[in-house]
Design a protein with these regions (language model features):
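C-terminal binding/interaction regions
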Residues: 1-55, 60-77, 83-162
Length: 162
């Protein structure tokens, strides 16, 4: 089993020192889903939500969330993202909206946390903009889809891993 890297032997938290690691290309994608009512789904799909373009605002919020990851997660490094994209897929049958946040950089540490923070922020924004219509929305299944680069190499999520 791998050791935790964010703790010293005495148990105190520490930001991992990455100064000796080479700058390499890093990329990650994360996903998550929000389950909404038929009313919310229609309002988002038809651009009739009272607060405006829900997915447009959520896309920008997801990008901002990814960029501000190190301000939210205490031991994360500040990562100079070279790209961040947030996309959405709407499933009419299940009244759900799935977000994917893809991030990349050239640096000393990965961008998984930025992708996770981006997708989480996008989904939270959908909730915020639609909560007047449906307080029972459920955010679920947030996880890394894929990551590449660095010492640990390429990873692709396999559903049966859980």
């Amino acid at each position: 089993m791998a050791e935790f890297t964010h703790f010293k032997k005495d148990g105190s938290a520490v930001m991992v020192d990455v100064h000796e690691k080479p700058d390499t290309y890093r990329a990650a994608s994360a996903t998550g889903t929000i389950q909404v009512s038929p009313e919310v789904f229609a309002a988002v799909r038809d651009h009739t939500a009272k607060k405006g373009d829900v997915l447009g605002v959520a896309r920008l919020a997801g990008i901002m969330g990814a960029k501000k990851n190190a301000e939210l997660i205490p031991l994360c490094h500040i990562v100079p993202l070279t790209n961040c994209e947030v996309t959405f897929t709407m499933d009419e049958d299940t009244h759900s909206i799935t977000a994917v946040c893809t991030t990349s950089c050239v640096g000393k540490t990965g961008v998984e946390m930025e992708a996770l923070t981006g997708v989480s922020t996008a989904l939270l924004t959908i909730y915020d903009m639609c909560k007047a219509m449906d307080r029972g929305m459920m955010i679920r299944d947030i996880h890394i889809l894929e990551k590449d680069g660095g010492k640990s190499g390429h990873y692709i999520y396999q559903k049966e891993e859980k």
